[in-house]
């Protein structure tokens, strides 16, 4: 909690950009502080990814994964964007991390 506001970190495949944005808006209007992804690797931000060499791309993805775990640490709970029930390996690992750290886990579907 930050004051009277619950902090929620969004997790899920970045292919679901529209759902991330929609859920972020709704949770914010519901009175929560929402932490989301910084980049959409699977559904946007191509200008970032297209000019990276393989080594830089790998290091950047590792950094973003590590940063997302830090975002989970800051949150009271996570909200999983699992459109059609889809949960990929990265999201599965974030859910496991959140549970190991005593965070509540909620799901879109």
Predicted segments with their positions:
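Conserved catalytic or regulatory cores that recognize and/or transform ribose-phosphate-containing ligands
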Residues: 1-109
